[in-house]
A protein has these predicted regions:
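Histidine-centered nuclease catalytic patch
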Residues: 44-82, 92-94
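Polybasic, low-complexity binding patches
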Residues: 70-77, 88-131
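Short, cysteine/histidine-rich loop/knuckle motifs that typically chelate Zn2+
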Residues: 85
Length: 131
């Protein structure tokens, strides 16, 4: 499917420049290096190095806000970073909103919101070790 699972509207991988520009659209997480970690538009933490990694809960994809199937384009204004599970949940829905609190009871959404939390970082940028 063209424009699906993090590809452009022609089914090709996005360029490195586009990936970086879309990454910068994600919201920084206070106290954490924004080059490594940010939040997608739904508030779910994503990790820069996990772009396209659907085996990681921090994996993310480039989503077409308005899907190509509904007339959307590859223009940067129509692209957003989205945690991969949410991107699959969204599919070609348009308009689409992040799942609300009541929808978090759906198994696929609940798994995302309950299991995806930002890593614990100390002020020095080092991972905190739980004892």
């Amino acid at each position: 499917m063209a424009g699906g699972d993090g590809t452009d509207m022609h089914g090709r991988p996005f360029s490195v420049e586009t990936i970086e520009a879309v990454w910068k659209k994600a919201r920084p997480i206070s106290g954490i290096d924004p080059d490594d970690w940010r939040r997608d538009p739904c508030g779910v933490p994503i990790q820069r190095s996990k772009y396209g990694d659907i085996s990681s809960k921090y994996g993310w994809q480039i989503d077409h806000i308005k899907p190509p199937a509904k007339g959307g384009t590859d223009d940067l204004s129509n692209l957003q970073p989205l945690q991969w599970g949410l991107n699959r949940h969204k599919g070609d829905d348009y308009p689409w909103q992040c799942p609300l609190a009541g929808e978090q009871d759906k198994p696929e959404i609940r798994l995302l919101f309950l299991s995806v939390k930002p890593p614990a970082w100390g002020k020095t940028g080092q991972r905190r070790i739980k004892r």
